[in-house]
Amino acid sequence: MMLPRNSPHRTESTLAYNNNNSNNNNNNNGSSLFQRKPLAPINSEFKISKPQHIKPTTHSHTFTTPTPKTRNTATTTTNNNNRNNHQYRNPNLNTSLVFTPTKNSSSSSSSHSSSLLSSSPFVEEPENQPESNHTRATSHYRTTSTSQYKSSANKDASHSLITSSKRKTSTKQTSESTNPKRRTTTTATQNTNNNKILNPSLSSSTIRFSTVSSSTSSSTTSSSSSSHTSPKPQQQLTLDDFEFGKILGKGKLGRVYCVKHKQSGLIFALKVMSKSEIMNLKLEKSLRREIEIQSNLYHINITRLYSWFHDSINIYLLLEYSIEGELYTHLKKLKRFDNIMASNYIFQITQALIFLHQRGIIHRDLKPENIMVSLDNQLKLSDFGWSVQINQNQNQNQIHNQTQTQKTPHQKKQKQKRLTICGTLDYLPPEMIESKSHDFSVDIWALGILCYELLVGKPPFEAINRNITYEKIAKVDIKYPSNLDVDAIDLISKLVVKDPNKRLSLKEVLNHNWIIKNKPKWPKNIYK
């Protein structure tokens, strides 16, 4: 299903966190969650079913959350001995997560943490680890704004979130604003580089998560699964650990909130996704990829995924907060960018894509809506739900033929799924709409479309009819405005090429004349 560009579901970031509460914990020294520690291996099992009317208990899976370098943003700081410039990652993280069905059960608010653990429909069960150390009962006071947030993702369970007599009430309400959203495909891509096959039906098969690991930060990584015993988590997160601000955006799976960690005072973006919607849309695999890939990425132009946790209703991703919101919001306000700003933005995104491609990761959904703007016009590539990672020894030009030598019916079915269109219609390359094999060059095509949209204000193949858009893409029917810079046209024409092998490389983009001649005019606080 393709959504029209003027659909009300197109996301727009809104106002930042309410600063009235930002100074509550200024004197707090922070907790171990936000100290620089190596990422610990985690091995957990979960059970998932549709939300029940019970008091939710949250369980967390915490990655390292460093102290921010700048105000109001949770950016990464690590030991200089463990990184090279802004390209670094932890090779020790190896996570194995399992979704399995469970029977309906109930629990009371006064139950012990072990009973709460066993009654949750989405349960973590680490090996050789006491349950009391893994979770904690959520009997703390919770404001109405938190309950209001949870009920927005699942209205049927909203009454279960306000039954406690200990909870405070608040008249504070969050404001929402939406913009027309670009047409996107809704079919979940079935790409995977793991031998474990994800069955869309939770009642018939388990879903195993295996986090990507790497021996070096510069080599292409491969996906692996581990069953070793995990150490004690550094710290568990619950909704009680955060104060909620305004809504930053909303989508089909839930909303994104600006939150403040009470103990440390750090600001984050909390992405909330309804479990029922994830199961109904069969997007478990997409969520798995997003967590696997993004949690291992450490780059100045990529949004950090610090941690994730869940309760009986929702799954929560704790993300780096970008104070200026989406790039699309700024583009819509200014109509288009000049050559200086556009060239700087293309340079930053190219740096992020080079970092991803060196690690065998294809983003596959590059567009202004998935690019965040932080302080000093620093861009952050986000939303890795459509991304995929390929093995080092895999033929990168034949991603969908990972099981080409095996001919079992089940594998043939998986092969067909890998041909599914993913991403945004306006940014799809010809090889994807024609169901051909694709590789890293799909991101290069999308980079050319992004460059055109930043300079012109709209994608080159935009049309009122989906079939017309397909025809324009297949023929590469692109028209340039007369006022467009000649060097910019040259760059776009070398990126938006039908033959993937003839597209300009990312390193050549950095050295293109359009980038070189505008680079001295960029703001001095960016890439000195």
UniProtKB/Swiss-Prot annotation:
The active site is at 365 (proton acceptor). InterPro entries: Aur-like, Kinase-like_dom_sf, Prot_kinase_dom, Ser/Thr_kinase_AS. Residues 1-35, 48-235 are annotated as: Disordered. The keyword Kinase applies. It holds the Pfam family Pkinase. Its main location: nucleus. Coiled coil: none annotated. ATP binds at residues 248-256, 271. Its EC number is 2.7.11.1. One of its GO terms (cellular component) is spindle microtubule. It catalyses: L-seryl-[protein] + ATP = O-phospho-L-seryl-[protein] + ADP + H(+); L-threonyl-[protein] + ATP = O-phospho-L-threonyl-[protein] + ADP + H(+). Residues 242-515 form the Protein kinase domain. One of its GO terms (molecular function) is protein serine/threonine kinase activity. Residues 95-104, 129-155 have a biased composition (Polar residues). One of its GO terms (biological process) is mitotic spindle organization. The keyword Kinase applies. Residues 18-29, 59-94, 105-120, 185-230 have a biased composition (Low complexity). Keywords: ATP-binding, Cell cycle, Centromere, Chromosome, Chromosome partition, Cytoplasm, Cytoskeleton, Kinase, Kinetochore, Nucleotide-binding, Nucleus, Serine/threonine-protein kinase, Transferase. Belongs to the protein kinase superfamily. Ser/Thr protein kinase family. Aurora subfamily. Component of the chromosomal passenger complex (CPC), a complex that acts as a key regulator of chromosome segregation and cytokinesis. Has a role in error-correction of aberrent kinetochore-microtubule attachments to ensure that sister kinetochores become bioriented and connect to opposite poles by promoting spindle assembly checkpoint signaling. This is Aurora kinase.
